[in-house]
Structure formats: C-alpha cells, structure tokens
Amino acid sequence: LIMTSQAYRQASRRLAKIDEIDPDNRLLGRMNVRRLEAETLRDSILFVSGQWNPRMFGKPVPVMEDEVGQYVVGVSTNDSSNRPTGKTVSLGTDAFRRSLYVQVRRSRVLSFFDAFDAPAMEPNCTKRPTSIVAPQALMLMNNEFVLAQSRAMAGRFQRLAKGRLDAQLGLAWESALGQ
C-alpha cells in the first residue's frame, strides 16, 4: 500500500521553493534519496537489462564458486574431490529471478551481495552495515554478471530504438534513472 502512495512515488528532485519551506522534508514534498541495498541493486540491474524473471515461488536459485573463487549464481559440477569437471548446467531464466530467491548460506554469500553489504547470516543481525568503498565500484565495472546484463541492456535498447543512437541514449537515461 505504501508503494502506491503519492509520497512514495515522488521524484527526489530538490526545488529551492520547497527547501525554503521544508528544509528537512518533514512534509514529504519530495522523495528522499536512498541507497539501494545489495538485493535491490541486483534486481534493478536485471529489470533494466530486460532479463528479469518475475516468477514467484519454487526452488531457490543455486550459488556456486566460480574459477576465481567468487560465489556466483549457478550449479556446481565439481566432482567428489571438488575438482572442476568442465560440465555446465544451464539455469535458463531461473538465473534471473529476484534476489529474494537466491540461495543463502553463511559460507556461500553471493559475491555481488557481499560487496554491497548484504546482511550477516548469523543469528543476531540487528543492523545492516552500510559502506561506500572502492570494491563496490570495481564490482560494478568488472563483475561478469554486471557486464552480461549491460550487454543485454544495450541489445534491448538497440532493438527498441531501431538503431537510432539518440533514441538508445534516451532509453538508457530513462531506464537507469527510473524517469
């Protein structure tokens, strides 16, 4: 119900006239800027890329260790000695389900979530840490998931804009900023 309210759906643009009347935004003249949590950030990337799978319920999306030691969405095909077998298992569109469905284990936190302050998987996690550090920017520039979703987003905008560069840029701007 709150997400459909007018106050929640407002723009976060600051206007001098409103800032004079209500500098602390107690009257909710605008939406306060808020930091995206790890799960919300991943879901937003999936949605903007056009890959997002809205299917609800069902089995969790599995997490595995990749060849460089990061935990990523996927099915491990290692043998009983934990050696790579070279086999791959496709998750299809299940790999693009909401982060709510990503398997959570204390020993296997998705590396993307870990970089963006996912909650500690311990009995008493009363407060979620918040940080702004260099590894977050590096994750957004170099992570294979982010790069793949960026390519999917670019392809989607090329199709929608029918090759017109100005239209592609407009779509990217509107999608990235939610306007």
Each PLM stretch: what is its role?
Residues 7-177:
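An acidic, gly/pro-interrupted, aromatic-rich
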Residues 1-4:
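Short, functionally critical alpha-helical segments immediately adjacent to catalytic or ligand/cofactor-binding
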